[in-house]
Amino acid sequence: LDHVIASGEDVNIMVFDTEVYSNTGGQASKATPLGAVAQFAAAGKEIKNKDLAGIAMTYGYVYVAQVAMGADYNQCIKAFAEAESYHGPSLIIAYAPCINQGIKGGMVKAQETIKNAVAAGYWHTFRFDPRKTLAGENPFQLDSKAPTADYRAFIEGEVRYSSLKRSFPDKADKLFDRAAKIAEDKYEHLTKLAKLY
């Protein structure tokens, strides 16, 4: 992916972020968040996930968006339209619940889960459009609002987290507290980006 982005070619890339290797059975990956249980991380992943959007934005010439259809359909469509009209590499990262997350209530709750992820500050929506820099405007637009729901309550609504709480309650508390702090710091960082440019 990095090689394609670095090529500078006019290409649109869509990443469905399931936070695991979904196509091979749900193994932990660089996208798996801290505290989540997955294959090869049965006692909870102990390091935070890679910030793919942040890495792509460092190029400065890549259109980057994080979207969450269940949380903000209009932001999602706007990102698609902007990415398509951008002449250069564009990357859209969509929060995509999958069966490996163990959503309580099942996959029928996927759109509701996406909405709750944004409300809890678990996932953030934003757009980075390099064209705005050329126009003297801020290229970074934070679309999601400050979290209004409880982070821990959200993650404990998924088996990949609640199973850690059942098996290793003390460890789960420590990892979940760290994960909540990381999410809080991430939102603060994004609000600074929205003012920085």
At which residue positions do the language-model features occur?
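Thiamine diphosphate
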Residues: 1-23, 27, 43, 49, 70-87, 163, 173-197
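Glycine-rich loops and low-complexity Gly/Arg-rich segments
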Residues: 9-14, 37-41, 89-91, 116-120, ...
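Structural motif
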Residues: 10-14, 19, 54, 62-65, ...
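Short helix/loop capping segments that flank catalytic or ligand/cofactor-binding pockets
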Residues: 22-25, 32, 101-103, 173-174
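Acidic, Ser/Thr-rich peripheral helices and adjacent loops at domain boundaries
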Residues: 29-50, 108-128
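Conserved thiamine diphosphate
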Residues: 30-86, 156-163, 169
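Glycine/aspartate-rich loop-and-adjacent alpha/beta segment that forms the canonical ThDP
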Residues: 70-171, 178, 191
